[in-house]
Amino acid sequence: MLKFLKQVGDYAKEAVQAGRYIGQGLSVTFDHMRRRPVTVQYPYEKLIPGERFRGRIHYEFDKCIACEVCVRVCPINLPVVDWEFDKATKKKKLNHYSIDFGVCIFCGNCVEYCPTNCLSMTEEYELATYDRHELNYDSVALGRLPYKVTDDPMVTPLRELVYLPKGVLDPHDLPANAPRAGARPEDLVEKTEA
C-alpha cells in the first residue's frame, strides 16, 4: 500500500511539473501573440539601407583614367578594364569597363581606392535576374543613375525601427496606437478601397 501511495505521489508531482512546463511554453506563446508584428510588406514597403550600405556600384565613365587600381585591389580581380594607349596625347584611352555582379562580393575596395572617385556604392540591392549573364554590367549599365528607395513614389520607405518613440529600445513595449514599421495586410486593403 505504501509503495502504491508513493507511486501516486510521484505521478502527481510529475503531472504538476509537466503542467508547469506547458504553462511556461504557453506563456511565451501568448506573450508573442500580444506583440505587434514587425513584418515589412516587401514589394510595397522597403527598408532604407544604412548610410554605409554597399549595393550596386555606380560608374562615371568620364572620370575614369584606366589606371586599373580597382582591378589590383579587388580580391577576385573582377573589374574588366579595356584600354589602349593614345600616342598623340600619351595617355590611356578607356574603351570598355565592366563588372560582373554575379561574382562581385561587394567589398567596396574598388570604390575606396579609386583615385578619381569614378566608382561609388549605391543603395540598390535588388539585382536578381533569371539569367546570370544579365548581371555582367558594362559601362553603360554601371553608369545609369542610382536608384533610391526614397525616390520611388510606389514604395513606402521605412527606416528600421523608425516607429520607436525616443528612449524606447524594445519595439514590443509600444502603445497600441503607435505607428509601426510594416502595415498589416488588412490595412493595405483598407487603403486601396478608400
Swiss-Prot record:
Task: Show the catalytic activity.
Answer: a plastoquinone + NADH + (n+1) H(+)(in) = a plastoquinol + NAD(+) + n H(+)(out); a plastoquinone + NADPH + (n+1) H(+)(in) = a plastoquinol + NADP(+) + n H(+)(out)
* Source organism of this protein record: Trichormus variabilis (strain ATCC 29413 / PCC 7937)
Q: Where in the cell is it found?
A: Cellular thylakoid membrane
Q: What is its EC number?
A: 7.1.1.-
InterPro entries, A to Z: 4Fe4S_Fe-S-bd, 4Fe4S_Fe_S_CS, NADH_quinone_OxRdtase_chainI, NDHI
Function field: NDH-1 shuttles electrons from an unknown electron donor, via FMN and iron-sulfur (Fe-S) centers, to quinones in the respiratory and/or the photosynthetic chain. The immediate electron acceptor for the enzyme in this species is believed to be plastoquinone. Couples the redox reaction to proton translocation, and thus conserves the redox energy in a proton gradient.
Using the UniProt record, give the first listed, main subcellular location.
membrane
Keywords in alphabetical order, please: 4Fe-4S, Iron, Iron-sulfur, Membrane, Metal-binding, NAD, NADP, Plastoquinone, Quinone, Repeat, Thylakoid, Translocase
This entry carries the following GO cellular component terms, namely: plasma membrane-derived thylakoid membrane
Molecular function via GO: 4 iron, 4 sulfur cluster binding; iron ion binding; NADH dehydrogenase (ubiquinone) activity; quinone binding
**Family assignment from sequence similarity:** Belongs to the complex I 23 kDa subunit family.
Where is the segment annotated Disordered?
174-194
Q: Which residues bind [4Fe-4S] cluster 2?
A: C74, C104, C107, C110
Q: Name one GO biological process term.
A: photosynthesis, light reaction
Q: How does it sit in the membrane?
A: Peripheral membrane protein
What protein does this entry describe?
A: NAD(P)H-quinone oxidoreductase subunit I
4Fe-4S ferredoxin-type domain location is: 55-84, 95-124
Which major enzyme category is it?
translocase
Q: Quaternary form? A: NDH-1 is composed of at least 11 different subunits.
Name its co-factor(s). [4Fe-4S] cluster
Which portions of the chain have biased composition (kind: Basic and acidic residues)? 183-194
